[in-house]
Amino acid sequence: MTPLRPTRPCPECGKPSTREAYPFCSPRCKNIDLNRWLSGSYVIAGKPLGEEDENDS
């Protein structure tokens, strides 16, 4: 049977990803990544809250 999507390396450890935890290799790596988002280790760049552009009003 052909896989639904290609196997890619886990972004945390580099092992091949699994279908159950895609794009990660395991629930452990998935939880490590989630913890990094929740703790603020990962951020998406943007304006700080409260700053409005003059054109937004």
From Swiss-Prot:
Cofactor section: Zn(2+)
Keywords linked to the UniProt accession: Metal-binding, Zinc
Keyword Zinc on entry: yes
Entry's cofactor comment: Binds 1 zinc ion.
Stored InterPro entries: DNA_gyrase_inhibitor_YacG, Znf_NHR/GATA
GO terms, molecular function: DNA topoisomerase type II (double strand cut, ATP-hydrolyzing) inhibitor activity; zinc ion binding
Biological-process GO terms, alphabetical: regulation of DNA-templated transcription
Binding positions (Zn(2+)): C10, C13, C25, C29
NCBIfam families: PRK01343.1
HAMAP family, A to Z: DNA_gyrase_inhibitor_YacG
Stated role: Inhibits all the catalytic activities of DNA gyrase by preventing its interaction with DNA. Acts by binding directly to the C-terminal domain of GyrB, which probably disrupts DNA binding by the gyrase.
Family: Belongs to the DNA gyrase inhibitor YacG family.
Subunit organization: Interacts with GyrB.
Protein name per Swiss-Prot or TrEMBL: DNA gyrase inhibitor YacG
Organism: Brucella melitensis biotype 1 (strain ATCC 23456 / CCUG 17765 / NCTC 10094 / 16M)
Gene from which the chain derives: yacG
